[in-house]
Amino acid sequence: MIVNSLSLCYHNKLILAPMVRVGTLPMRLLALDYGADIVYCEELIDLKMLQCKRVVNEVLSTVDFVAPDDRVVFRTCEREQSRVVFQMGTSDAERALAVARLVENDVAGIDVNMGCPKEYSTKGGMGAALLSDPDKIEKILSTLVKGTHRPVTCKIRILPSLEDTLNLVKRIERTGISAIAVHGRNRDERPQHPVSCEVIRAIAETLSIPVIANGGSHDHIQQHVDIEDFRQATAASSVMVARAAMWNPSIFLKDGLRPLEEVMQKYIRYAVQYDNHYTNTKYCLCQMLREQLESPQGRLLHAAQSSQEICEAFGLGAFYEETIRELDARRADLLAKTPEAVEEPAEDTSGIIKMAIRFDRRAYPPQITPKMCLLEWCRREKLPQPVYETVQRTIDRMFCSVVTVAEQKYQSTLWDKSKKLAEQTAAIVCLRSQGLPEGRLGEESPSLNKRKREAPDQDPGGPRVQEPALPGEICKKPFVTLDSSEENLLEGC
């Protein structure tokens, strides 16, 4: 996907803000449906992106940037190619340019996060830490402007002093960036503090480039008409909406907010169509439900442990099944057209024990997996640890793993979405062929449970091993323990 150089205009636009864990592809597409002109992805760290490989996903019709562990870090599609802005977290000009060149043919703009106050960002010299180093800001932005053919922007917070703020933004403007987004709070302020509209106004009146006002959710923006009021209060060219859009993306719709259940169902459809990980889907839906998490539907969402269960909670079970059938058919069609891309494990298959099975996470307790059970059995039998060898098909990026135990190989004939799932499936084949328990609900290994309970007492002075989250904690935690700093994280940093 290639779009015209420097074609993105930041004048008089409604913009979806970058939000950690929220600004993934389903939310961006939904915001575009409801009237957003520009959508930002969540902040992605430069070092993480530089480990990624660009992959064209023909099954989903997307472009994926995939980490070495096979996790999709950034996914985009043709629908948003001329309106999506890639936001990075960086503290180094050369790394920033390398990331920009990696993604520039698949996005419409490049943005640098210079406002996130969270420790994970500032400790690395990124986010709000850059505000105290204008020389580094200038180097990063100048390097990007000169080195990429996409419009470059940055998103900042204001400084405690208006004079210092204006001096900084004037220096930023001289780097040649196309626009600047301003969150009207300083790095120590949180959403409960009032947004400084007058400071954003002073910036807008000082600069000649578009100024994008941010930080007005809740206090100023509760419905669509409020967006224009906030723009006028700040004299900004455009408005960037974060939390209000996270709560209900139809805030961008001129005709007014749509019913929340309708919005959530539309979001879920995009999540399934684009194979969004269910934990991310669940998190975003929880942000929309907010105080309704204790409702019957909220409890169903709370308990959901897969995309299918999320769909069933919202009456979309049939849609899920139909979509999966369509994706499977598309995958099979692609494989049929390119048989040379169907890769089998490199080993001689004559001695491999095979079964047509897949690992289903829902059938196992949160703390127990087939791989754990197989490893424990090997230890008891004084056998070498299991050895997993995994291959990936080029055409659909599916995985198949072969596990070797006591010189015997085991493999499933069904391919999985990830290397981790494929390894779990191979472990199941081995365990079932030996008639061994695999840790399914109701048949947990006593030795595994014993090891789990005794672990904290083995070395009282050593580091504690964090237990995996219980089902639903991903959904529930933000609304039980969400403090002001966490809310600030959602405001787009």
UniProtKB/Swiss-Prot annotation:
Residues 1-333 are annotated as: Catalytic domain. Residues 367-371, 420-424 are annotated as: Interaction with tRNA. Coiled coil: none annotated. GO terms for biological process: antiviral innate immune response; tRNA dihydrouridine synthesis. The keyword Transport does not apply. Keywords: Cytoplasm, Endoplasmic reticulum, Flavoprotein, FMN, Oxidoreductase, Phosphoprotein, RNA-binding, tRNA processing. Residues 369-436 form the DRBM domain. Its cofactor is FMN. GO terms for molecular function: double-stranded RNA binding; flavin adenine dinucleotide binding; FMN binding; NADPH binding; protein kinase inhibitor activity; tRNA binding; tRNA dihydrouridine synthase activity; tRNA-dihydrouridine20 synthase activity. Residues 438-472 are annotated as: Disordered. Belongs to the Dus family. Dus2 subfamily. FMN binds at P18, M19, V20, E43, Q87, K155, H183, N214, G215, G216, A242, R243. InterPro entries: Aldolase_TIM (IPR013785), dsRBD_dom (IPR014720), DUS-like_FMN-bd (IPR035587), DUS2_DSRM (IPR044463), tRNA-DUS-like (IPR052582), tRNA_hU_synthase_CS (IPR018517). It catalyses: 5,6-dihydrouridine(20) in tRNA + NADP(+) = uridine(20) in tRNA + NADPH + H(+). This is tRNA-dihydrouridine(20) synthase [NAD(P)+]-like. Its EC number is 1.3.1.91. It is found in: Cytoplasm; Endoplasmic reticulum. It comes from Mus musculus. Interacts with EPRS1. Interacts (via DRBM domain) with PRKRA and EIF2AK2/PKR (via DRBM 1 domain). Its main location: cytoplasm. The keyword Flavoprotein applies. One of its GO terms (cellular component) is cytosol. The active site is at C116.
